[in-house]
Amino acid sequence: MKFYQQYLDHLYQQVPVGDPLQQFARGYEDYLQCPLQPLMDNLESQTYEVFEKDPVKYSEYEKAIKAALMDLVKEEELDKKELVLIVVGAGRGPLVRAALRASEASRRKIRVFAVEKNPNAVITLQQQQLEMWGDLVTVVSSDMRDWNPPEEDYADILVSELLGSFGDNELSPECLDGAQKFLKPGGISIPYSYTSYIGPLQSSKLYNEVRNCKDETKHPLANFETPYVVHFQVNEKFLHHR
């Protein structure tokens, strides 16, 4: 029996750990979650921490910011030109850190404004500004739609991550419309655009979970018309991406 257990332990240790996305999403497979509403609610620190573990997103943001910096500042302007980069909805600062890394990698000078309405996240930003960022970053405690910087602080690059899970569920256009006023003519918005895709699939597990969600104050079918955030694992897709 001892050898049998040792063999099972050996097999378990040989199980592939999965790619970074699989590791990040472990424990959330086929689990119904309500979409977040960060404009209406102030997110908790634990929620930000989950976001910041995304293994792909911030790396891609860093690449995009670096490309924008190199496009706006030519080699002969390295010592003369300093760009203003504004992060709207800065959270606890992952995009600020990505911007500073991109600045260092591209050798382009930037001044960063981190605009955040959540007072809890602002405290974290201010602490990082005090301990690490110094004069490179200015923390602004304000709703991006209400902030009115002086014209000399208008953005050459405007960065946001209000992408949401699907469509406009985090009110990205509504928020960014108010922030467009401090983007310079010819400035760059990251992301420039994004697209949501929809396709049919079948999942017996999720169907039964939704069916078991009962609320006496709602119509019996209301839960079937409610949006959920799900990391799919056991399902059958009827239309594959081309």
Language model segments and positions:
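Class I SAM-binding transferase module
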Residues: 1-57, 63, 72-83, 88, ...
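Pre-Walker A adenine-sensing motif
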Residues: 67
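Conserved SAM/SAH-binding loop
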Residues: 92
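Aromatic pocket-lining residues of Rossmann-like dinucleotide-binding sites
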Residues: 99
